[in-house]
Amino acid sequence: IRCFITPRVSSQACPDGHVCYTKTWCDNFCGINGKRVDLGCAATCPTVKPGVDIKCCSTDNCNPFPTRKRP
């Protein structure tokens, strides 16, 4: 499987059986910059803390950098 990986947001090969993930959360600058984003791959879908959103998927390049809605 190929997943997008931060910080360069480049597509990279991940080991067999891994899943891609997109993790987003707010920090002190969320109102200005939008949510922080972490893209990667892991053996299983990571467990996250409250306030952190995660989406996992298992097809090539299924975790592109999310687009920010403009007001």
UniProtKB/Swiss-Prot annotation:
One of its GO terms (molecular function) is ion channel regulator activity. Keywords: Acetylcholine receptor inhibiting toxin, Disulfide bond, Ion channel impairing toxin, Neurotoxin, Postsynaptic neurotoxin, Secreted, Toxin. Disulfide bonds join 3-20, 14-41, 26-30, 45-56, 57-62. Signal peptide: none annotated. InterPro entries: Snake_3FTx, Snake_toxin-like_sf, Snake_toxin_con_site, Toxin_cobra-type. The keyword Disulfide bond applies. It is found in: Secreted. Expressed by the venom gland. Belongs to the three-finger toxin family. Long-chain subfamily. Type II alpha-neurotoxin sub-subfamily. This is Long neurotoxin 1. The lineage of its organism: Eukaryota, Metazoa, Chordata, Craniata, Vertebrata.
